[in-house]
Amino acid sequence: MASSLYRQLISQNYYSTGNEILLDQQTNKTTVDYVDAGNYTYAQLPPTTWGAESTYESAFSAPEITGPYTNTVIKLSDLSDSNVWVLYQKPTSTVKLLKNGPESYSWNLAAFELWYGKANTTVTSDYYSGMTNSEKSVEVDHDSLVLFWNEGSTALSNKVINFSWNVGGVLIKLTSNTRIDICMANMDNFTSDSFNWEEWTHNFPRSASMNIYTDYYLASVDPYSQIRALQQPIITTVEMKMVKVKREGSINVDEVVSKDSLWQEVRYVRDITLQCKIESEVVKGGGWGYDYTSVAFKTINHTYSYTRAGEAVNAHVTISFNNLKERSYGGSLPTDFKIGRFDIIDVDTYMYIDYWDDSEIFKNMVYVRDLRADMGGFNYSSAMSYYFRIPVGQYPGLHSSGVRFTYERSLLSQQFTDQVALNSMRFVFRATSSDGWFMTAGNINARRIASGTGFAYSDGYVTETVGTVSFISLIPSNPNYQTPIASSSTVRMDLERKINDLRNDFNELASSVALGDILSLAMSPLTFANLLESVPAIASSVKDVAANVMKKFKTTKMFKKAAKPKYKEYIIGDLLEDVTNLPRSTTAMDFDDITSAVMVSTTNRLQLTDVETLSEIVARSADDFIPNRAYRMIEDGMVHEATPNGVFSYDLATLQQRNFDMEKFMQLASKSPVISAIVDFATLKAMRDTYGVSTDIMYKLVASDAPTIVSFINNNNPLIRNRIEGLLRQCRI
C-alpha cells in the first residue's frame, strides 16, 4: 500500500555527506566576533514623556457606563436600574435615535420617537409621517434632540432641546411596571459642577421594548462628570505644542548624544502609526460535517503605509496573543453540531504587536538603550459573524462585536518578513473590556444557544492608533558603515515563510483531488521513487534529494517511535502512535495509505522548486495529517477499539457494546494485527441500520478492506463517501 513510502523512509538510511556538511554550515554554525568599540561615554538625558497630538477618548472610565452597544432593541425588563441614561456620541448628520410604541401609528396608542437634528435642518418624524399634523416636522437652528410624541388620543406634540455636547442623551425613569418617564434638558455648556437632567419630564405608558437605530451607551449613574471630562481634550494639544516649541524642531528628531572617532550615540524620536489586524482561522474536523475542530486567532503578518513628517513609511507588524481563554460547544457526534475549541480574548489577554518600518531608525538598530514609548490604546469594534456550514438545517453563527486594549509597555524584539530577519519593537497591549460573544442557532437574530464574556471571532478587521517612540542607538560615526541586520536571515524562518505561502495552495489542491483518484493511489505501492517523480522541477540529484528528505524525516514523531525498542506490552497512548511497524493485512487500508497518497498527489500538482520545502511537506504529512486516529483489533468476533477519547469493545455481529478488558487489550496489542479504523463505529452502525449490511460485508468494513471500501465509493454510498471525505479534509498543512 501507499504507506510503504513512510516505511521505506524509516527502514532505509539515505545520506549524502557533502550535502549535510553544507547544510550544517549554513544553518547551525555560530561565529562570535568581538569588536572594541573604543572609549565613549553615555549622556543620560532627563526623562521625557512624548505625546501624539490630541487624542479623544471614546471610552468612559466609569464601570457604571457601558457600551457602545450595537443591538437594535432594548428590552426594558432587562434594565436592572430604575434610572437609566441613554447616551449618544453626537452624530454628524440628522438621524433617528430611538422609538417606543407600536410598529405603526395608531391614534389611540401612545408612542414617542427621538431624533438628532443637525443645525439649520428640518427634522421630520418617520413614525408620524402619515399624519397631516404640522407637529410632525421641526426646523432646528442648533444641534438638537427632538422628541415627537402622542399619548392615547392626545394630539401629536414635540419637544426640542439643544445638544451642544460631544456626548449626551436622555434620562429614562422606570416608574412602574406599566409607566416610564422621559426626562430631557438643554445640553449647552459645562459651567456648573452638576446638571439637572429633568428640565422637562413626561410620563408615558411602558412598552416591552424600545427600538434603537444607532450605537449607544447606557449609564446607571449620573454621567455628567464623565461627559464633562471627555469634552476637554484641548489640554493634550496645548501640552504637545509646548513640547514642540521647547525642542525647537519637528517631533521626528535625530540627535547626536555622544561621539568619538569610531562610534556615536544617536537619539531617535518618531511618531508612529500602529495598525491592529485580528483574524480567526476556522478548522473543520472530519466525520459527517457537523464537527469543527477549532476557531483560533492566527498570528498575523500585516503591512501598511502612512506618511510621517512628509516621509512615506512602509510598515510591517506581526500580531500575536498570550493568555487566551478556551471554550468548547456541542453535543455528541455524529449529527450534533460541535466545536472542539475556540479561543476567547478576555480581560488580561495580552496582544503583542511587533513593529518595523523601512525608515532610517531601523537600519542600525543593533545596540539600543533608553527605549521609551507613549502609545494610545485600541478600540477594536466591529460587528463580526461566522456561520458554520453544517450539512442540514440552519447554519449556527458565532458573533463578536468589540474588545478594547490598553497599552502596557514596549521592548525590543525580532520578527521575520519576506525571508528577512529584522530587529523591531514590540508593543504590549492588555485587553481591559469587551462587549461579549454569543452563538445563535441561525442568523444573528435567531435564538441564542450560548454566550459569554470576551471576544471570540474576527474577520480581519483593521483598526489603528498613534503614538511616539524614542531610543538611543549606537551606530558607526562613519555613515558608510552599515550593520547587516537588514539582510540577515535564517534558513528555518525562510522555510516557515515558504510553507505559509504554500499552505493555501496546497490545501486547496488537496481538497480538489477526486476521491477515486486518491483511493486508487492509496492502493498502489508508493515508494520514494514515486515521490521524486512528483516533483520534476527540483534540479538536485536524486542522492541529494533523498539525503535532505531523510534528514528531515528523522525528526518526525513517526520515525522516533519506530526507531525505539519495542516493549512486550503497550500502553494505549503509545499504541495510537506505534502502529507503523505492526503486522497487517495486505488488502487492508490504513491511515498512512491515505495521507501519503494525498501528499504525493498534491505535491505533484504544486510543482515544487526546492528540496527543503519538499522535505518539510513529507515530514508534516507523516505527523500532522489525520490527527484524530482510531485503531482496532479483532478476535473471535469481538472488536476492541482505541480512540483519542477512550477505549471500548463491541460484538461484530450485533454491534452491541461489551465490557472492555484492559488486560486482554494489552495482550492483543503486542501480538495481534492492528487495523486502522478507516470506517469508524458511527458509520458502521449507520450502515447496518440504514442498509442492513450482511455480517461478511460488515467484517470487511471493520477490517478496513480496501476493495470493499472502494466498491462502496464507486456505488456512491453516501455514508462511506462522507467518512472518507472527512478523513481527506484532515490532510492539511
Swiss-Prot record:
Pfam families: Rota_VP4_MID, VP4_helical. One of its GO terms (cellular component) is host cell plasma membrane. Residues 492-512 form a coiled coil. Gene3D superfamilies: 1.20.5.170. Keywords: Capsid protein, Coiled coil, Hemagglutinin, Host cell membrane, Host endoplasmic reticulum, Host membrane, Host-virus interaction, Membrane, Outer capsid protein, Viral attachment to host cell, Viral penetration into host cytoplasm, Viral penetration via permeabilization of host membrane, Virion, Virus entry into host cell. It comes from the Viruses. The record marks 228-229, 244-245 as: Cleavage. The keyword Repressor does not apply. GO terms for biological process: permeabilization of host organelle membrane involved in viral entry into host cell; virion attachment to host cell. Belongs to the rotavirus VP4 family. This is Outer capsid protein VP4. The lineage of its organism: Viruses, Riboviria, Orthornavirae, Duplornaviricota, Resentoviricetes.
